[in-house]
C-alpha cells in the first residue's frame, strides 16, 4: 500500500475512542492516506471488529499492527512508522480528532514549502467526561496557545506547546533527525520537536483550529489523557531530556569548561527569578487578603446601615399609619359635627 500520508493511530482497549478516531480520519476531504493502527497489547479481536464496521473505502486503507507485549505510548509510534514509509506522516491517537480539512491544508503546505520539516495547525483543547460505556460528553473548548503564531526552537525549548494531533511531519526529515525516543514514558514528542526544529523550519497554518486535543479530567490511566494521569512523569521526563542534552554538550569539554559555568549561571538566574516571582506572588496574595478584609468590613458596615435604615422605614411607616388613622378619625368627627349642626339649624 502506498499513499501520500501515513496516519498512525496508537490504541489500547479503548473501543469507543478508536471508533471516534477512525470517524475523524474518514471525514478528511484529502483521502490519499493510509492508516496504521498500533494495537499496543490490547484486544486485537476488538480492534478488528471496529475496523470491519468501517466503510470499504476506509477499511481498505487500514493496517493493524499488534504488539504482543506493550511497548508503551512513546515506543508504540515506531511500530506504526516501521509498517509504512510514505512522504508525510501524522500521529492521530485514538482519543483525539481532526477538522475535515486538516490533511488537505497541511499536505498543501508541505507540498508548497519543501524546506519545511513539518507543519502544525491551530489546535483546540476539548475537555470531556467519560460515560460508563466509554463514550465521551463534551464539557467545554479552549483554543491552545493563542499567543503563538508559529513554531520556533526558542519557544519549544521553554515548553512543548504543539501536541502531535496538530502536526504533519515530513518523513525524510524525521528519518534524518531520529524518531521518538521509545525509552521515555512521556515527552518523546517534545524531544522530537526539539530535534526537528534544530534541523528544519516548521510551518504553521493559522486561523480556525484544525486539530482537537481531547482532555479527560480522570485519574483512570486507561481512559485519561497522560497530561492529567501522568503529570509527575511529564515533569521528570522533561528534566531528564534537558539533563541529557546538557551532558551531551559538556561531554567533549574539559571539566573546567566555561560552558558549564554558563549553564550554572543561567540556572542561578532562573533560581533567583523564581524566588522573586514567589515573593511577588506572596506579596500579591497578602495585599489581596488585606483588600478582602477591608471589603468585608465595608460590607458589614453597609449591612448594618441598611438594617438601621430598614428599622427607620418601619418606624416611619408605623407613624404614618398612626397619622392616617388620626386623620380618618378627625374627618369622621368633623362629618358628624356637620350633620348635627344641620339638624339643629333645621329645627330652628
Predicted regions and their residues:
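Nucleotide-sugar donor-binding/catalytic module of glycosyltransferases
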Residues: 1-240
